[in-house]
Regions:
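A generic structural signal for ordered secondary structure
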Residues: 69, 112-113
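Short, solvent-exposed loop/turn segments that connect beta-strands within catalytic domains
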Residues: 105-107
Length: 256
């Protein structure tokens, strides 16, 4: 009997699955004084509060090849899922680990999916892989089915703060501060190339959530599964769920 495993970097918002062996390779956030490892033991609230107060710089670090090999374990067939290669080196590290694993373990196979996305969309992709495994599909058929599924999924997002982006040098600290003072939210989507593309700058959380719901329709969503991810904002996630349920029929929504 083949031993099957799903492995993902920790951007996926999951740490366990119901029916399939699953493991994450942790992302990290590093400052001059501290290192945060994104695993099941991470105090997310404590980390977020620390980074919000941080005056210095921070940087993120993707799993390295050794991290991926450790996560692979000794499975016969591995389905590996990474955050978009447009934002991180996670995919390249996973591909390097795949080459080493398959070279050292004859007959064992790894497929690496570059999601070209982040967060909740990765969750949907992982759940699709598990669904295919439950149907006892072959390795090749699972790869084909999930690749086709990824062409039908998408990501839209809302950011209330640009503080972390300022800390790691992606945006000007002045811009981040002005956005916060003005109460502006950034609403955008994951592009086909795997970058995060800002589209709207509504003022106020409620208007931003309404804009986000409108983006779903603009991106062609009509019915099906939606995964909502959030950081320290469960109330906004619940409001978004209500807005979506009011606008669309035949929708199944999970909040992570």
């Amino acid at each position: 009997m083949r031993k099957i495993k799903i492995v993902a970097d920790s951007s996926c918002d999951l740490f366990e699955l119901t029916h399939t062996e699953f493991e994450t390779a942790p992302m990290k956030i590093i400052t001059a004084e501290r290192e945060f490892v994104d695993d099941a033991n991470l105090d997310v609230d404590g980390m977020a509060d620390y980074l919000y107060q941080l005056k210095g710089k921070s940087k993120s670090s993707c799993p390295n090849t050794t991290d991926w090999l450790d996560a692979f374990g000794d499975a016969d067939e591995i389905f590996c899922v990474t955050i978009t290669s447009g934002l991180s080196g996670s995919y390249n590290s996973a591909c390097a680990a795949k080459q080493i694993y398959e070279a050292e373990k004859e007959g064992k196979r790894v497929h690496v999916f570059d999601t070209l996305s982040a967060g909740p969309e990765i969750t949907l992709i992982i759940e699709k892989i598990e669904e295919c495994i439950d149907k006892d599909m072959s390795f090749e058929d699972i790869c084909d089915c999930v690749t086709a599924y990824m062409k039908k999924t998408g990501l839209v997002f809302m950011l209330k703060s640009l503080k972390t982006f300022a800390n790691n040098g992606r945006v000007s600290p002045i811009v981040a501060k002005l956005v916060g003072i003005a109460g502006i939210c950034i609403v955008g989507k994951a592009s086909d190339e795997g970058t995060l593309e800002p589209m709207h700058k509504p003022r106020g959380e409620r208007r931003a959530l309404e804009t986000l719901t409108g983006c779903l329709e603009a991106e062609g969503f009509k019915f099906g599964r939606i995964s909502i991810g959030h950081c320290q904002n469960e109330s906004a996630a619940e409001q978004l769920k209500e807005l979506i349920l009011a606008k669309f029929k035949n929708v199944s929504i999970e909040i992570h």
